[in-house]
From Swiss-Prot:
Subcellular location: Plastid, Chloroplast
Gene from which the chain derives: rpl16
An example Gene Ontology biological process: mitochondrial translation
Family (UniProt): Belongs to the universal ribosomal protein uL16 family.
Self-association state and partner proteins as the record states: Part of the 50S ribosomal subunit.
InterPro entries linked to this entry: Ribosomal_uL16, Ribosomal_uL16_bact-type, Ribosomal_uL16_CS, Ribosomal_uL16_dom, Ribosomal_uL16_sf
Signal peptide: none
Biased amino acid composition, Basic residues: 1-17
Name the record gives this protein: Large ribosomal subunit protein uL16c
Annotated GO CC locations: chloroplast; mitochondrial large ribosomal subunit
Organism of origin: Lemna minor
Chloroplast in keyword set: yes
Lineage: Eukaryota, Viridiplantae, Streptophyta, Embryophyta, Tracheophyta
Amino acid sequence: MLSPKRTRFRKQHRGRMKGTSYRGNHISFGRYALQALEPSWITARQIEAGRRAISRYARRGGKIWVRLFPDKPVTLRPAETRMGSGKGSPEYWVSVVKPGRILYEIGGVSENVARTAMLLAASKMPIRTQFIIEG
C-alpha cells in the first residue's frame, strides 16, 4: 500500500474540501482515464484495490498510471478511551480528492477494455466517477 517514506509532521488537521481540482485534472500519460465527480478522502487501501482491479482486467496489455498519492495521515483514538490526553496516533493514509481530479489512467488497450477496467475500479471508489477519453 502507498504511504510517504517520511513526513515533516506526524499529524495533520482534517481540513476542508471546497472547490474543484485545478491540478491533476487533465489526462497526462495514457489515453483513457477515470475522473472524480465528488470531493472525498480516498484511502491507500481503496487506491490499491482500484489499481488491482484495473491490472487484473487489463492483463499484460496496456500500462496503468495511478495519479493520486495518499499523503495525509488520519488519526484514530483507541476504542473506549476517555476524552482528552491528546490526539490519537496515525492509523492510515488518505488522498484528498476534489471534483475533476484524475484518479487512474490507462493506455495501450482498446476503449471497451479500458472502459470495463475503469468501471471495475470505480466500484471500489467511495465517490461517483466518470470515464474520459483524451482529446
